[in-house]
Amino acid sequence: MSKAKLSRILLSVVIVNTAVVSVAVDWNASHIFNPTWVPHARFHDVVMLWLLSSLSAIALWLLWRRSAEPQVSTTVATLVPMLFWAPFFFTTLLVPGTSLSAMPDEPLPIIAGIPIYPNVVIATINEILAVIGYWLYRSHNETFKEEI
């Protein structure tokens, strides 16, 4: 399998995973149907999920369509999940009163004395896979340029 195809498959997995996991995690009693959330907060979560799902569909289209500028298409497609997951690493530092934990009463898993936030683990995995996918694309592109 070529690096270009492997790259597109890996990036597709990240894009689909980003949309599907986000909807699956938020479409429940801890988020959208949480009775303690004000209706407008629920509205914003649904809007965010719709936007993410729509952008993910566009990213997949950009990734797999024939393009006169495949570098631009691949870069934009890669940025969709990367920009979605990035705030999981800094939002709680920038906005006081926010939390990575949906249910503060539920204990977090602890590994080597460090509390592990599942959201951050998922974000980290997706960011790493997106970087690997993009690197595969760029390394294929550089190899292709050298052969010309």
Predicted regions mapped to residue ranges:
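Alpha-helical transmembrane segments of multi-pass membrane proteins
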Residues: 16-29
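C-terminal halves and exits of single transmembrane alpha-helices
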Residues: 81-98
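Membrane-interface capping segments at transmembrane-helix boundaries
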Residues: 135-148
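Membrane-interface interhelical loops and short amphipathic "cap" helices
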Residues: 27-43, 100-111
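Hydrophobic cores of alpha-helical transmembrane segments in multi-pass inner/ER membrane proteins
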Residues: 50-61, 122-134
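Interfacial segments of alpha-helical transmembrane regions
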Residues: 2-15, 68-84
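Individual transmembrane alpha-helices with interfacial aromatic-anchor signatures
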Residues: 80, 109-126
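Core segments of alpha-helical transmembrane spans in multipass integral membrane proteins
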Residues: 22-23, 41-63, 79-86
